[in-house]
Swiss-Prot record:
Organism per entry: Escherichia coli
InterPro entries listed in its UniProt record: TraY
Domain of life: Bacteria
Record GO terms (molecular function): DNA binding
Lineage: Bacteria, Pseudomonadati, Pseudomonadota, Gammaproteobacteria, Enterobacterales
Keyword field: Activator, Conjugation, Cytoplasm, DNA-binding, Plasmid, Transcription, Transcription regulation
Family recorded in the similarity comment: Belongs to the TraY family.
The protein's name: Relaxosome protein TraY
Spans through the membrane: none
The keyword Membrane is assigned to this record: no
Function description: Conjugative DNA transfer (CDT) is the unidirectional transfer of ssDNA plasmid from a donor to a recipient cell. It is the central mechanism by which antibiotic resistance and virulence factors are propagated in bacterial populations. Part of the relaxosome, which facilitates a site- and strand-specific cut in the origin of transfer by TraI, at the nic site. Relaxosome formation requires binding of IHF and TraY to the oriT region, which then facilitates binding of TraI. Also positively regulates tra gene expression.
Keyword Transcription: yes
Subunit text: Part of the relaxosome, a complex composed of plasmid encoded TraI, TraM, TraY and host-encoded IHF bound to the F plasmid origin of transfer (oriT). Interacts with TraM, probably through its C-terminus.
Main location as per UniProt: cytoplasm
Length: 75
């Protein structure tokens, strides 16, 4: 189901499973900010993606070659 969001675009729903510690931290953060849990997640996820747009960059990954199926570098 598509819904319009406050920013004027179409929004998508994403479900996640959180461990107890992460959930408790999120609840404390939303209580401090006065926002809903959903809005707190949206803001924090958007911020993370802006600050770390290339989280998996070429320093960590390399292109798959014909000889290898692995995309991870040996660390």
């Amino acid at each position: 189901m598509r819904r319009r969001n406050a920013r004027g675009g179409i929004s998508r729903t994403v479900s996640v499973y959180l461990d107890e510690d992460t959930n408790n931290r999120l609840i404390k953060a939303k209580d401090r900010s006065g926002r809903s849990k959903t809005i707190e997640v949206q803001i924090r996820l958007r911020d993370h993606l802006k600050r770390f747009p290339d989280f998996y960059n070429e320093e960590i990954f390399r292109e798959v070659t014909e000889e290898s199926e692995s995309t991870f570098k040996e660390l």
